[in-house]
Amino acid sequence: MNNKTKRLLDYDEKHVLHPYTSPTKPIRSYLVESAQGVYLQLSDGRQLVDGMSSWWAVIHGYNNSYMNEAITQQLHKMSHVMFGGLTHEPAIRLAKRLIDMTPKGLEHVFYSDSGSVAVEVALKMALQYWYSLGRPQKCKFATVRSGYHGDTWHPMSVCDPVTGMHQIFTNTLSVQYFVNKPSCKFNKEWDPSDLDEVERLFEEKQHEIAGFIIEPIVQGAGGMRFYHPKYLKGLRDLCDKYDVLLLVDEIATGFGRTGKMFACEWAGISPDIMCIGKALTSGYITFAGTLTTHQVAHTISEGYPGVFMHGPTFMGNPLACAAAHASIDLIEQNKVLLKVKQIEAQLKKELASLATLEAVVELRILGAIAVVELQDEVKMDLLQDLFVEHGIWIRPFGKLVYMMPPYVITSSELSFLCSAFCAVITKYLR
């Protein structure tokens, strides 16, 4: 390690707060100098194949020339302009593209600058919808356990109280209704009784519940679980039956990650409100969106105070809109759903040996997602360093070691990633 790198890392450790990391007992951070394709270039000269897509966002790889050019062109025109009282072509055209590609019935788009804020917006929309209808008592939310929806205030209240990483705030957050997580797995037999608890809750509390929020098909940071599409289909039906809005959080799953453009397509349903983010801009600029129906948007506008009460400073940022256009262009041009199917097949083949290890509870693969659930919680610092030593970047948590590689990864790069992934886990479990 040279002197410059050491100085930077020392200052970082002393003064820069990292996510879910203690400044007094820090886990090692690696200094990244540049990135290209699926590779992270470290300051010490090592290259790592990124198996995380930088927390599931960078689907088109790093330093993508098409993405760079789109952002650069927009930068020379207009980097930012307020969205109150003003608008611009990139935001207008993006709204049309999103409405055209998302499930039928979503006709209005609200832009924000992060996934957590997109969820905040979704929850506020649901509350204001019922307020406008003269039913303010419908002010609580229902959700499943093992869910995760972000780290801002209202989203924390609908994260799992135990696995959602927000236990210390339990006594100050809004109290919501939780049902057990879906028990029927994605590729196993469906049991309709999986939804009985939801129906019992709706029968008893429908007058209080504004909406049911859920991550469609894949529960992300709350457990990386894949559940049966018929659960989501049945949930849609129950929401209709009991007059509850259905909110889906597609921030991690949207734009092809599960093998469908949006995960709720596995169930053939349309939500009342949908959140998107992460891959929307391929991680190039922070950006997110909340889509809703004509009924929700217009009902809000017809009640008091006549407008939806939210307005981020960087709403509809032109650079972010340009990045989103470029990302969607590449999704369409590169036939990413076909590529994701190829990634899925290779993951199933090359990670199969992990399922035989005694300490592995389950190997789960869907689309471009692979999850190894272990019996015990991992030692993150040890395991992270082992992955780096083997030339790959993987960030485990809890009992889970998983990968979500960029869609642009080649077959040989994926083989290297899988080989190192298997070698490290096998070594770690010895």
What function would you assign to each model-found segment?
Residues M1-R430:
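Conserved N-terminal phosphate-binding loop of PLP-dependent enzymes in the Aspartate aminotransferase
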